[in-house]
């Protein structure tokens, strides 16, 4: 129960931050260009800082084994996400993309660090990496209807991949950063939650809530993304032995996060229904304030038995 209350409090704080972004956009203080700038700061500054910071832990056999377990778990969970989403929304590319891909980087990390610690980010880095690789390949193919391969240069120069590479080097070499760099990293990482929620608020402000309420597909996508897939993942994490609670909770929350904001980015990039994509992101984000705490509470009951 204590974990659930901590998580619920964190979710409420995040939604208050989203309300700031919402109000600022509606008041004309954040423009569409300003929203893009916030997104760029997230992608190129705060999220990489959070990832690198997560790797600044002591190298132990336990952590190395945990990293391998988290890689295997992330691969299995994302395969489940893609398969379930495809089965549920065969003819709707945006719905299938939205149901398959969550938002662990911007939404999951603040929740995971709230109930665990900054070091738990270490275990969800593989999930974030694999998810983005799938979005670039399978996700784009889904939206365009064309088979696309991975662009090696794009993958290797992506901010999150560079951050993971730097983090792994620091972890395996045991190098210590000077205090001035770790403090700078702390400040940049601290931007992640407020910037991410300001961005969510901007997305919400672009939506007509009356139209959203009338679009039945949004409820279906949210149900699959926030309830069906997380329950399947919860079952898998419960029955598979040898997985520590840091990895369990990290993977569960990553899989239970709302629709990733990249859906709207890719929809606009490939001339798909941008409004529908934004509404899908917004609706699932609103609903997750209820689903994530309940899911974590259920996990706490099952994993304490």
How would you label these PLM feature ranges?
Residues 1-305:
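Alpha-helical transmembrane segments of multi-pass small-molecule/ion transporters
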């Amino acid at each position: 129960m204590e974990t659930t209350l901590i998580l619920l409090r964190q979710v409420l704080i995040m939604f208050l931050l989203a309300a700031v972004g919402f109000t600022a956009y509606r008041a004309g203080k954040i423009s569409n260009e300003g929203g893009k700038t916030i997104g760029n700061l997230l992608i190129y500054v705060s999220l990489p800082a959070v990832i690198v910071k997560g790797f600044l832990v002591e190298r132990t056999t336990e952590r190395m084994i945990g990293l391998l377990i988290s890689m295997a778990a992330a691969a299995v969970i994302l395969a489940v996400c893609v398969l379930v989403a495809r089965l549920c929304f065969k003819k709707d590319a945006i719905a299938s993309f939205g149901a398959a891909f969550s938002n662990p980087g911007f939404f999951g990390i603040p929740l995971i660090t709230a109930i665990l610690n900054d070091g738990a980010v270490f275990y969800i880095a593989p999930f974030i990496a694999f998810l983005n690789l799938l979005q670039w390949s399978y996700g784009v193919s889904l939206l365009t209807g064309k088979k696309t391969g991975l662009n090696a240069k794009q993958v290797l120069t992506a901010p999150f991949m560079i951050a993971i590479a730097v983090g792994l080097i620091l972890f395996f070499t045991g190098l210590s950063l000077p205090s001035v760099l770790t403090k700078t990293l702390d400040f940049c990482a601290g931007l992640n939650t407020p910037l991410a929620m300001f961005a969510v608020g901007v997305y919400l402000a672009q939506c007509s809530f009356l139209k959203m309420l009338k679009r039945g597909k949004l409820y279906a996508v949210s149900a699959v993304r926030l309830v069906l897939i997380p329950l399947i993942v919860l079952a898998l994490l419960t029955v598979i032995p040898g997985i520590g609670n840091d990895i369990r909770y990290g993977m569960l929350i990553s899989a239970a996060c709302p629709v990733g904001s990249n859906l709207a980015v890719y929809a606009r990039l490939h001339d798909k229904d941008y409004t529908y994509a934004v509404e899908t992101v917004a609706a699932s984000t609103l609903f997750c304030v209820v689903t994530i705490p309940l899911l974590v509470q259920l996990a706490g009951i099952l994993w304490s038995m």
